[in-house]
A protein has these predicted regions:
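Short, amphipathic alpha-helical interaction segments positioned at domain boundaries
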Residues: 4-43
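Acidic-basic catalytic patches of nuclease active cores, encompassing PD-(D/E)XK
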Residues: 39-102
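Short acidic loop-to-beta-strand element that houses the catalytic metal-binding Asp/Glu
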Residues: 106-114
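Active-site beta-strand-loop-beta-strand hairpin of nuclease catalytic cores
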Residues: 113-123
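Basic, amphipathic alpha-helical patches used to engage nucleic acids or provide basic targeting signals
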Residues: 123, 133-153, 173-174
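Short beta-strand-loop-alpha-helix junction that forms the active-site gateway
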Residues: 126-135, 164
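Domain-level recognition of nuclease-like catalytic cores that cleave nucleotide substrates
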Residues: 153-196
Length: 196
């Protein structure tokens, strides 16, 4: 019986606080907690995507440095829209290119492979993500690649795009019309064979 009296007194004196907590404070607290967790999730997802992209760039750069010219037919079969006389060659330098300091606009190209002899150099864009590659991205890449070719004095070059998730149909038509090579072949991401 005493518990019942205590409960009635407690509810009467604290009912406003209980109602306020149940209808406003608790949902606000959970909303803030959810937003904080969502923000952390987005940050981690962004880092994961960045690492995924960097991994793909690294593996493709390794393939171009050590494997592509040795297994020319295999690597050509993984590409579309290459010039008829294209062959992978030994590249003097293969790296991810960043525009010089104070260059306006600042830009970054995923892969620049400069040919040693008279072969084709490669300027590449790498996308290792779920979304397909779009025409808008192709135009932006083409613009950056043109600026890179001018800055680095790259003469004979092939632009190429690697997109693990493929391309929109209108993007393939655009790439073909512009003479840009492309690939969605996962074999590019196979680790290069050691000791060759």
């Amino acid at each position: 019986m005493q518990d019942n009296i205590f409960d009635k007194v407690f509810r009467r004196s604290c009912s406003d606080d209980i109602d306020k907590f149940a209808t406003r404070d608790a949902p606000d607290e959970y909303r803030r907690l959810f937003e904080e967790i969502q923000e952390r999730y987005e940050r981690l997802r962004g880092e994961y995507s960045r690492y995924k992209g960097a991994f793909a760039e690294f593996v493709i750069i390794s393939q171009l440095k050590s494997e592509a010219f040795r297994m020319n037919d295999r690597f050509i079969s993984m590409m579309e829209n290459l010039p008829a006389d294209f062959e992978f060659t030994e590249y003097g330098n293969v790296w991810s290119y960043h525009s010089p300091p104070l260059h306006d606009p600042e830009f970054q190209i995923d892969i620049l492979a400069k040919a040693k002899g008279g072969g084709y150099s490669l300027i590449g864009e790498v996308k290792n993500r779920k979304a397909k590659f779009s025409v808008r991205e192709a135009k932006a890449f083409q613009e950056k690649a043109g600026e890179l070719a001018r800055l680095e004095n790259v003469g004979k070059a092939v632009l190429f795009v690697f997109s693990i998730s493929g391309f929109h149909k209108n993007t393939l038509a655009y790439l073909k019309k512009q003479g840009i090579a492309w690939s969605a072949d996962r074999r590019w991401l196979d680790a290069p064979k050691a000791g060759r």
